[in-house]
Amino acid sequence: MRKPKLSKLERLEKFDIFVSLSKQRSVQILMAVGLLYMLLITFEIPFVFKTGLSSLSQDPLTRPEKHNSQRELQERRAPTRPLKSLLYQESQSESPAQGLRRRTRILSSLRFDPETFNPSSKDGSVELHKSAKVAWEVGRKIWEELESGKTLKALEKEKKKKIEEHGTNSCSLSVSLTGSDLLKRGNIMELPCGLTLGSHITVVGKPRAAHSEKDPKISMLKEGDEAVKVSQFKLELQGLKAVEGEEPPRILHLNPRLKGDWSGKPVIEQNTCYRMQWGSAQRCEGWRSRDDEETVDGQVKCEKWARDDSITSKEEESSKAASWWLSRLIGRSKKVTVEWPFPFTVDKLFVLTLSAGLEGYHVSVDGKHVTSFPYRTGFTLEDATGLTINGDIDVHSVFAGSLPTSHPSFSPQRHLELSSNWQAPSLPDEQVDMFIGILSAGNHFAERMAVRRSWMQHKLVKSSKVVARFFVALHSRKEVNVELKKEAEFFGDIVIVPYMDSYDLVVLKTVAICEYGAHQLAAKFIMKCDDDTFVQVDAVLSEAKKTPTDRSLYIGNINYYHKPLRQGKWSVTYEEWPEEDYPPYANGPGYILSNDISRFIVKEFEKHKLRMFKMEDVSVGMWVEQFNNGTKPVDYIHSLRFCQFGCIENYLTAHYQSPRQMICLWDKLVLTGKPQCCNMR
């Protein structure tokens, strides 16, 4: 039976009902999607905060966190350089739990006993053995208290008491001192929270007359002269809170030399210094910087001043000629120039202002710009916590303004980034190609972090074909030891040698490195370096592999026929070293031993037959010579590419590198594939 046809009105009514139902259904779907979105947001935000932000460093001086995947990093940088050669390639089959069969022991396995440090009068090391015995006994006690939790409880009690008595330290917006106040403080003005962009320091002073020096540091005595007249002073921004017990880094060294410079003319010299290693000096000698030379915030590095000689450069001669012709043609010079004298004069008051710009420091004297010095890698404004003024100068007053009013922390451990990205991989079951033992001090938190973030990211280290560990003794400060233990437990790359640390006993860490590399890992090669040494891992391993496997080897920057210094800071007494010459020895910042030599060193130590000397690198040379003479011939391989002082192009190791320079060296190596130095101004 055929259905009756619907009228137009009925059809419209049905269509309206359909549209209404469709709208309701759309609203319901939209509400469901919105509810689902809210649920996702609710669960996702805590996850992001928990996993993402927790891995970010709170240290404003550190670089951004590395990408989670090295593969992602490679994709981002692929146009510049494929990173297969340096960075570890992640495998999809790998899981976080894989390879956890062996974990690094925090405490060294090197065996100490009461007989270990019995002094021997035969080799002149009586005093060294005595101090080693005391250091071991004290260190053992410190470690026991650290393990039991006594140290942590004592520290919490001390901290609470300190806050009750003194409150928390605050940062001042400005600091001012009179000349007499500065003198009372040992010519040091503390800058509580360092400097920041826009900070400025004003010094009002008067240079003194020249005095005679028989041993001048800035010039050489002429033949027949007994002394030279010198007048100079130094303003230095120093990192007073960098590492306790060490020379503070000189973040800026400003040295006006009125008289006595080797050039015979007044100059202003500027530089930086880290661990007694000076950079390349910037000297202003009265000539204006060239037009094609880089500027600092638009200012030239050196302004011109009147010189008392008639020597002029070719550029100046041509400039004068052009000005003369311009004057003849137009009738007047293009611009009026004033030639100022050298900004400092004996017994004449001056006002010097040092300001921190975007690209560097700017120095003006009596309102006139004199010189600008660009910031250097590894030296930052925040770390400049002290101003020192020394030399031939009478200071009337010092004022520092626009200082930062807050700083996150000056504790050394602020540099630690507790991220799993930097944790050491587990020890492999198979033999490793090379073990690298890194000498470090307890409070060198920044140095260790820089090593983790730089050359320890090499694919050979991440894949455990090369294993690297820090070797640290116990510190005199309780809080350092507490933080050190936490660091060791988290990163898994620290081996603590249980004795109280001192420079003369560094040799014990070296023996511990040999024990770990030869016994714990059975590594083919054992390398020793310092925590301010950058290691080009693949090149160093290739250098070691050049020697046939059945040969004993000793590789490094080897010194021959060196004699002991009998005077000065590094002096050695005849009781300590009676011989006239040292044995051939490789410089301490980086050298390699074969496994058999390392085993010999440990064996002699455990039998209490190992002769020890306070200079660690000389000690190793002495042990290698003993092995060479009595056990098996050794191949001595000398290479200047194990750089002792600073960095050279095509280095194998670079020494005296600050934490930021370490990161810079790694970035250059990753991006270019070539060992290039940083800070080569």
Curated annotation (Swiss-Prot):
Superkingdom, natural source: Eukaryota
Pfam family, one: Gal-bind_lectin
One annotated GO molecular function: hydroxyproline O-galactosyltransferase activity
Topology in membrane: Single-pass type II membrane protein
Pathway: Protein modification; protein glycosylation
Cofactor(s) this protein cannot do without: Mn(2+)
Record SMART domains: Gal-bind_lectin
Main location: Golgi
Function: Possesses hydroxyproline O-galactosyltransferase activity. Transfers galactose from UDP-galactose to hydroxyproline residues in the arabinogalactan proteins (AGPs). Is specific for AGPs containing non-contiguous peptidyl hydroxyproline residues. Utilizes UDP-galactose solely as sugar donor. The addition of galactose onto the peptidyl hydroxyproline residues in AGP core proteins represents the first committed step in arabinogalactan polysaccharide addition. AGP glycans play essential roles in both vegetative and reproductive plant growth.
GO BP: arabinogalactan protein metabolic process; mucilage biosynthetic process involved in seed coat development; negative regulation of leaf senescence; protein O-linked glycosylation via hydroxyproline
Glycosylation sites noted in the Swiss-Prot or TrEMBL record: N629
Taxonomic source organism: Arabidopsis thaliana (Mouse-ear cress)
Tissue specificity note: Expressed in junveile leaves and stems, and at lower levels in cauline leaves and siliques.
Protein name: Hydroxyproline O-galactosyltransferase GALT6
